[in-house]
Amino acid sequence: MPTAYVLVNANIGKEEHCFKELKNTENVKEIYLLYGFYDLVIIVKANTIKQLNNSLKKIRQNNNVIKTETMPIIE
């Protein structure tokens, strides 16, 4: 199952709003607020690489997302 960890930098003051929006994104299995360099970590699992890529694209297109760092999991 294609899986990726996504680290997210959100707009200042919009971290919780971003969390609420992204938790309903298709294929998002887990999401956590962080303190430190990144604001969120998201675990995305999909049935196909195409579905994974589509979910990653939706995350990146969120208006409150400034930057993402994606780490695909090799099984």
Predicted regions and their residues:
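A compositional/biophysical signature of low hydrophobicity enriched in polar/charged and small residues
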Residues: M1-E75
